């Protein structure tokens, strides 16, 4: 044990001597073997009154912050021009006013909207109510025809069951002598 302690002291002082750093005396003798470990330049201070600060491992917030920055950028990139466009439309065009419909004139479906942007969207992107009505009527007609065909099919199946006829009469049955029953008679062979 004493040899290990002596070896440790010698190695520390040798490293300190080679590096050029001064060592403080440990026992007061100032000899080569009695020197201690290198002293720190300043006492160790921990910031705050709660002792040593710890390094907590947390998940990275890089992607969250990047996403939020890009979200703000693209909202500003699209939101500002849209706000300017809506303001210009409201100032220079304005909302539609209710007026008397001339005799014999049938208004288009987008003319019932008050705001010009709503009118433009209804004219270019929405279907007219007549088209929606016709499409719904076509779907209802197809569903009614399908239901009627299902009822007819049920009636046909019921009559086939009652009368004893069916699709098996349309196919010729094979001769019984052609069927080989030997695998069933001796399954272990």
UniProtKB/Swiss-Prot annotation:
Organelle targeting peptide span: 1-46
The keyword Cell membrane is annotated on this UniProt entry: no
Membrane topology: Single-pass membrane protein
Chief location of this protein within or outside the cell: mitochondrion
Subcellular location per the Swiss-Prot or TrEMBL entry: Mitochondrion inner membrane
Keyword Transport among record annotations: yes
One cellular component term from this protein's GO annotations in UniProt: respiratory chain complex I
Entry's family note: Belongs to the complex I NDUFB5 subunit family.
Record-given protein name: NADH dehydrogenase [ubiquinone] 1 beta subcomplex subunit 5, mitochondrial
Organism: Pongo pygmaeus
Organism ancestry: Eukaryota, Metazoa, Chordata, Craniata, Vertebrata
């Amino acid at each position: 044990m004493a040899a290990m302690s002596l070896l440790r002291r010698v190695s520390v002082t040798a490293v300190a001597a080679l590096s050029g750093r001064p060592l403080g005396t440990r026992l007061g003798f100032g000899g080569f073997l009695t020197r201690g470990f290198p002293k720190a330049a300043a006492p160790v201070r921990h910031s705050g009154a709660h002792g040593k600060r710890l390094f907590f491992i947390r998940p990275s917030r890089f992607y969250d912050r990047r996403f939020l920055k890009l979200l703000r950028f693209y909202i500003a990139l699209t939101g500002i021009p849209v706000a300017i466009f809506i303001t210009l439309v409201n100032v220079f065009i304005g909302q539609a006013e209710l007026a008397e419909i001339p005799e014999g004139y049938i208004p288009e479906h987008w003319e019932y909207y008050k705001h010009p942007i709503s009118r433009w969207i209804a004219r270019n992107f929405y279907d007219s109510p007549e088209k929606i009505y016709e499409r719904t009527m076509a779907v209802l007609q197809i569903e009614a025809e399908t239901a009627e065909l299902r009822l007819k099919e049920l009636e046909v199946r019921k009559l086939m069951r009652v009368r004893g006829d069916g699709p098996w009469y349309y196919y010729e049955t094979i001769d019984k002598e052609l069927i080989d029953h030997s695998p069933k008679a001796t399954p272990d062979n």
